Amino acid sequence: YGRGHFCNKLKRSILLLFLLGMFPYAWGQQTNVSLNLRNVPIKSVLSQIEKSTNYYVFFYTDNLNSELSKRVNVTVNNTPVVTVLNQIFSTTNISYEIKNKRQVSLFLVEKSSPKSKAQAVKSNKIQITGTVFDANNEPLIGASVRVLGTTIGSMADINGAFKLEVSPGDVLEASYIGYNPQQVKVGSQTRFQFVLEEVANTLDDIVVVGYSSQKKETVTGSISMVTTKDLLQSPQANISNALGGRIPGLLSVQRSGEPGQDMSTLRIRGVGTFASDAESQNPLIMVDGIEVNNLNDIDPNEVESLSILKDASATAVYGVRGANGVILITTKRGELGKPKISFSTNVAITNFPFLPEPMNSYEYARAYNEAQAYDYYSQLSYIPRYSEEAIEAYRTGSDPLFYPDINWYDYMLKDFSTQTQTNFNVSGGTERVKYFVSLGVFTQNGMLDTGIYDPGYSYQIAFRRYNMRSNFDINVTKNLLLSLDISNQMGNLQNPNWSTGQIMESLNSTPSNAAPGVIDNKVVTITDVFGSGRNPASPYTRGWKSKYENNLNLSGRFTYKMDYLLKGLSLRGALSYKSYSTETKTYNDRGITYDLRRAGDELIFVPSTDPGKLTYQGTNSRNIRIYSEIGAEYTGKFGEHTVTGLVLYNQGKYYNPTLKYNIPNGYQGLVGRVTYNYGNRYLAEVNVGYNGTENFAPGKRFGWFPAYSLGWVLTEEPYFPRNEVLSFLKIRGSYGTVGNDKIGGDRFLYLPSVYTYTGSNSYYFGEVGSSYVGYVGSNESKAGNPDLTWEKAIKWNVGADVKFWGDRIGLTFDYFMEHRDNILCNRNTVPTIIGISASNLPAYNMGRMRNSGWDGEISVGDRIGDWSYFVKANFTYAHNKILEQDEVIRNEDYLYRTGLRYGQFFGYVADGIFNSWEEVNAAGRPEYVMANNNNKIQPG
């Protein structure tokens, strides 16, 4: 702690000496500005100077408001700032002083009259001292403390301390770049302490993009971002569920609530291809620049920010891997300063929001008899299944063993369950090493009521996840930064041998009178009265299984600055090793149930099978992914021109024993990016990915995937009218191409599949009836297609970012369109004369699909005194259409799926059921809806 604190002070003291040693007036003379303003307030001129330069103007509004409201004309071209200031203040009672270019650029003070100077001499001066700190109790070295309306001021030293000579009644203001200024009136006290809060300005947010980061106001692609604060607002079980409804353009569908299986399926701007396998539709997931398969293993407390890259401009650098969009996760890292320790835990209650209310046994018996009586085929010789005596026994509950009445939902399920999330992390660092270390535990329990039966082992559904992460940033030398990351996620999922779906299906289909439940720790059935021989608790007797997962990630990155060759040039590289292993243990029980019978006054439990021992079955698997990259970056600033460039080579290998032919899966690619920024006003970007694949024949393996984008910040234009309503306006557009090389798990699509040994008589020779003999041999399965090439998608995007009333209201809107051609697919039709099935035909490029829509976000927020509020809403609409596919010939045109949405439900829309014999006799057939109101019933 002592060394880190000293280094922190040393860094800030160096910054202070740097600030004090500058030549501010010379800088003001060197900085030029071009303005063309007519009849505008002086305040508007100052705002334009702020936007066109690095200056920040500070003044006390109450003293200078009338002077700053005076209107002036300013027409200058590449003129020094000091000349402009002299011009606009020449007819006012305002003077100025340029302090420095980093902290406070301009001070505006009232000109002192001789009378006021004389009064100042006569006033009683007092010596005051104080400190300026941030919210983390760190000194703000170089912070300005001044007396408003005068030229009296001071700067905070290495300890954040200052000293001034002031008069009672003066107003002190402490300010620091990036922080809200704070004011206090001088009374009799001589000691002051200022604690400044950081300015919340979303336009200055840093957005993580592919292999880099940019200021949000200069981004030209379609990118949305959330922070760890957003992810932790609700106690979700995983990140995919936490993202639901939080990001425009991201569609989330949760299909299960089972512990460990309740993650959501994520799609960025819908589905752009009709390839049915998930891999062809899933977005690419990157964590700290390294590809991962599953984001749900990550502890949300480890996440610093999460970006969604949606258009071609944002995803082109990922080539074929980013065809369906990219999710970039940036984990937390250490910061300079003393150790910061954080501990958090939360407990959430889970329950079923709705369960059916079943009939009791009495109602069921009555309804069953009535339903059978109305059965047309049985009504002539119908004998009620349930006698009146049995129905009365159900009603009174006089014999609960043989005439039971059990609500199986209440009997087998708990009212609620719990899940917990606990995290402990520590971060900090010195000038040499910064660190972030995190430990997390997540537990999630199921809803089965395990108290009704004890087989000697636990069959409750339960999930446990343990997370560990350590991120280290090491300044090896002045120019070399090395980052070492280690993360490990371990999960354990336990459940009965019967799936949750089977258990719930049993609850839904078992009537209340089927069985008496569990008696004396025996799962009981009844078959000799009216029981069905079923008991929904019988899955509890079949054993249990556990699945263990271990995900280990090791990665190292370096950045080497080469300013000695060219300022702004740096080399970068990364190497990662990812190991994923699973082990499944299954313990099978005999599944003994007992049929209950009565012999006089004695109850007899007849076992369904003989008792036995548990049997064990285990499986395990492992895969390894190795990734490496090397590249160079450049950032150059030339006046108002900023140019950045990136060239990067990457490759990866994936090892998995289940891969076809036991050959590792390889990947290679080149990445290029160039951005241009003129005065934060005109923005341009070119991205390109060059990728190779194993699936296509030589000569077709590599493909170029370029993307282009432009942006225009209108509010940075000198002629744009400045007002309090519209504070920021940017329009942007992008166009690009992305590709896909995958179709299911098939590999080497240009080659035929391996010949297989038939193992039976498949080849016959000779004449039938005499020498006709069958022989075993090899046969070809799936054929290859050497003409196969890339599936490509052309993507368009136009959007706008708008801020109103000093950024209190924000609006982002995007319209997108994707046209995908040469879709990789298997044929659905094949002429019978070919003699092979469609499943053995090779893959083809035959299919077209269009996907379009819009998304956006509206945010409202402000700070009122010590209170702040923030409201955000987003919207997404995506609509796809299959333009061409290989489809079986239909008898009617309306039966074709081509021209409809992918995955659209198909069939007639029912209009209810018949409720009386009159309706049955009158119609004679089901009733359907005329969806098109054209007096024709068609599927919809």
Which sequence ranges carry the predicted segments?
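A short, hydrophobic/aromatic-rich structural module that often spans a beta strand
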Residues: D157-G160, S313, P358-A365, Q372-A373, ...
